[in-house]
C-alpha cells in the first residue's frame, strides 16, 4: 500500500518517505481536521468573538435545536431539550450528547462528527460567515481557518464541505457540511510544529499558548465521568497525559488522527513530530 511518513525534530525535517505516492498530493484529513477546529475555537475566544469555552452554543447558533424527529441523521437522532445547555467545551471534547437522547451534556464521551459540525458552524456564525439558509454562500469555517491559521503559518492546504449520504429530510444545513481539510504531509507537519511550539510561529502567537496546553490533556468531563480506558481525549486532540493511549510513549505526547491513517503525532519533550499520511 502507498504511504507517506515525515519526521521532524528541532524544527527541521529529519526523514521523509513517500512510497508509491506523490508527496505533493493533498489527502483528506477526515477527523484529524478536528484538532484545527480546536485551535480556531481558542482563537475565537482570544479575539472575544466567543466569550468562553463554557458559553452555551445556542446563544451563538440557536439553529442547532431545529432538528425534530425524522430530521436527524437517523430516526432516533434529534435535538432534545437538554441540548440547549451544550457548551463549546463539550462540543470540542466530544461530550456534548448532541442529538443523542439519554446522553446529558458533559457526561458521556461519544466520538461523533455532527457535534463538531455544530461547533464549526457556531464559530463561523459568530464571525458572520455561515448561515443555514444557504450554507455554501458564506466564506465558511474553512476560509476562516485559512485567514487565522493556515496563512500565518504559510500552509497550502485546501478545504471543502463534506456530507454523509443521508435521507432527504435530514437537516444537513444545520448539522451537516463537515469542514474537511486536504493537506500534504508538510502541511500536516506545519500544524504539528505550531502545536509543539504552543501556538507560536516564528515569534507570532497564532493560537493562544494556554489553549494548546489546555486542549492537549484529557478533559475533566472524561476524567470525572468515564472509566480509565476512555481517558484518552482532550479538546480536539488524542492525549497521552494519563498514559492510556500509548503506555510506552512520553506522557506529554498527543495527536490529531483521522480515518485513512492520517496522523500528526507531537511530543514536546522530544521536540519531535511524526506525520503519517497515505496517498
Report the location of each language-model feature:
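Solvent-exposed loop and edge beta-strand segments that line ligand/cofactor-binding
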Residues: 25-29, 80, 103-111, 174-182, ...
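Flexible glycine/proline-enriched surface loops and loop-helix/loop-strand junctions
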Residues: 22-24, 101-105, 116-117, 124, ...
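Flexible, glycine-rich surface segments
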Residues: 160-223
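A short, well-structured edge-of-sheet supersecondary motif
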Residues: 1-22, 264-265, 271-275
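Active-site SXXK
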Residues: 11, 28-53, 119-123, 188-191, ...
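Active-site-proximal alpha-helical segments within enzyme catalytic domains
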Residues: 115-122, 179-200, 262-278
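Active-site helix/loop module of the DD-peptidase/beta-lactamase fold
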Residues: 28, 47-98, 128-178
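Active-site Gly/Thr loop motif
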Residues: 162-165, 217-273
Amino acid at each position: 500500500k502507498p504511504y507517506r511518513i515525515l519526521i521532524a525534530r528541532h524544527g527541521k525535517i529529519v526523514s521523509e518517505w513517500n512510497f508509491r505516492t506523490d508527496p505533493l498530493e493533498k489527502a483528506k484529513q477526515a477527523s484529524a481536521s478536528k484538532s484545527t477546529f480546536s485551535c480556531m475555537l481558542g482563537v475565537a475566544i482570544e479575539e472575544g468573538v466567543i466569550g468562553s469555552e463554557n458559553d452555551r452554543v445556542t446563544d451563538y447558533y440557536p439553529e442547532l435545536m431545529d432538528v425534530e424527529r425524522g430530521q436527524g441523521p437517523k430516526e432516533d437522532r434529534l435535538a432534545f431539550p437538554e441540548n440547549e445547555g451544550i457548551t463549546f467545551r463539550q462540543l470540542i471534547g466530544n461530550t456534548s450528547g448532541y442529538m443523542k437522547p439519554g446522553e446529558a451534556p458533559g457526561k458521556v464521551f461519544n466520538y461523533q462528527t455532527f457535534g463538531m459540525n455544530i461547533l464549526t458552524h457556531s464559530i463561523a456564525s459568530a464571525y458572520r460567515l455561515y448561515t443555514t439558509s444557504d450554507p455554501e454562500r458564506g466564506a465558511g469555517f474553512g476560509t476562516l481557518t485559512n485567514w487565522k491559521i493556515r496563512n500565518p503559518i504559510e500552509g497550502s492546504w485546501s478545504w471543502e464541505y463534506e456530507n454523509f449520504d443521508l435521507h432527504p429530510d435530514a437537516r444537513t444545513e444545520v448539522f451537516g457540511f463537515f469542514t474537511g481539510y486536504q493537506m500534504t504531509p508538510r502541511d500536516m507537519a506545519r500544524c504539528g510544529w505550531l502545536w509543539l511550539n504552543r501556538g507560536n510561529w516564528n515569534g507570532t502567537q497564532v493560537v493562544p499558548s494556554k489553549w494548546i496546553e489546555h486542549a492537549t490533556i484529557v478533559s475533566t468531563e472524561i476524567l470525572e465521568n468515564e472509566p480509565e480506558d476512555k481517558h484518552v481525549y482532550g479538546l480536539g486532540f488524542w492525549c497521552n497525559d494519563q498514559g492510556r493511549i500509548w503506555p510506552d510513549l512520553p506522557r506529554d505526547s498527543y495527536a490529531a488522527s483521522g480515518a485513512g491513517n492520517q496522523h500528526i503525532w507531537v511530543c514536546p519533550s522530544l521536540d519531535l513530530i511524526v506525520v503519517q499520511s497515505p496517498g
